[in-house]
Amino acid sequence: MLSPTNSTSKTAPVPPRDSSKPVLISEEPRNQLLQKVARTALAVLLVVVTLGLILLFYSFSDLQSFPWCCQTHPSTKEQPTISIPVPLPSPPLAVPRPSTPPPPVISRPSTPSAPKPSTPPPLLPKAPKPVKTQEDLLPLVPEQVFVEMYEDMARRQTIEALVPAWDSDIIFKCLCYFHTLYPGLIPLETFPPATIFNFKQKIISILEDKKAVLRGEPIKGPLPICCSKENYRRHLQRTTLLPVFMWYHPTPKTLSDTMQTMKQLAIKGSVGASHWLLVIVDIQARRLVYFDSLYNYVMPPENMKKELQSFAQQLDQVYPAYDSKKFSVKIAAKEVIQRGSGSSCGAWCCQFLHWYLKDPLTDALNDLPVDSVERHENLASFVQACEAAVQDLPELSWPEA
């Protein structure tokens, strides 16, 4: 049975596509083509960027200097020149002429030519300025100064060999020896010695003990280390002169610091900047005598005299005289005694004390030799005599009064 639809209107079925048939342009060549195009475009882009960078970093005048740059040509073209050959003229015919004598040569006086400007001589290079060293800046020292320095050094060595430094032990033995010659002197111990900070208290304490002994009262001050109590009382009763040796150093400013410095120098076995001073308290003559072989090592003599005068007024109240006589003050040294020596101060103090014991109104310091070596030679004789005399004395013991 036939269908009601027309057969001609029917569409023919599409046959299935065969995948095995080749395609005109495959996918792989197409990708390769795209890669080549991309590479070419990238290369062109890089060239453009490079040229742009060159234009940025170089001006136009710099670009013209490159060999590959075209040179500019003038706008007007040169007109070509047409050369027309011109025939050379023939030489003229030679016509003989009568010979004429040459004109006479008239010599004219030569005018002096203007002098050429002289060229200045070439300037010579300036010599470099000499560089002054530190030695050139120092003033020249005359030869005589070196001679005097050498003589001074030799003089000092000679003096140091003549008079050695005296310590507290030798000074105490010397005081014991003086007591045998002058019983009115009390050999005060020098260990520890008095200082600039406590010598006044020490003198007042001894005078207070002397008054107590004269009244028959017990003494209140400290007893000496190397003397018995009874022997010390007998010394106080008979004494009329107190030799107070002071140890001084310029560095410490208090008593405790002075004692510490003294201890340190004793351990080192060095005198350093230490110095011996002497204060004589003459009870019978009511006199304070101050001796400094360096004259003003502690303080100016005027200041020391004022200080001792104030102390003398204090002694008038502590130990008054029966006739109301006041203590006077005397500064013995008028100049530097130990010139050329730094360690003979102890020996000079003992020498002055010996002169004072022989004559309280002595002017022996005014009769000293001017030459420092001769002066210390005389002192060396005194030192040798004292050292020989103290050899028979007991070690660190007070003589019996």
Swiss-Prot record:
Expression induction: Expressed late in the infectious cycle.
GO biological process, one term: protein deneddylation
MF-aspect GO terms: cysteine-type deubiquitinase activity; deNEDDylase activity
Keywords in alphabetical order: Hydrolase, Membrane, Protease, Secreted, Thiol protease, Transmembrane, Transmembrane helix, Ubl conjugation pathway, Virulence
UniProt membrane topology term: Single-pass membrane protein
Transmembrane feature ranges: 40-60
Biased composition (Polar residues): 1-11
A Pfam family recorded for this sequence: Peptidase_C48
GO cellular component terms attached to this protein's record: extracellular region; host cell; membrane
Listed InterPro entries: Papain-like_cys_pep_sf, Peptidase_C48_C
Active site: H275, D292, C345
Chain segments carrying region Disordered: 1-24, 77-130
Residue stretches of biased makeup (Pro residues): 86-128
EC code(s) of this entry: 3.4.22.-
Location relative to the cell: Secreted; Host cell; Membrane
Known partners and oligomeric status: Binds to host NFKBIA.
UniProt similarity note: Belongs to the peptidase C48 family.
Function according to Swiss-Prot or TrEMBL: Effector proteins function to alter host cell physiology and promote bacterial survival in host tissues. This protease possesses deubiquitinating and deneddylating activities. Impairs ubiquitination and degradation of NF-kappa-B inhibitor alpha (NFKBIA), thereby preventing NF-kappa-B activation.
Protein name per its UniProtKB record: Deubiquitinase and deneddylase Dub1
Species annotation: Chlamydia trachomatis serovar L2 (strain ATCC VR-902B / DSM 19102 / 434/Bu)
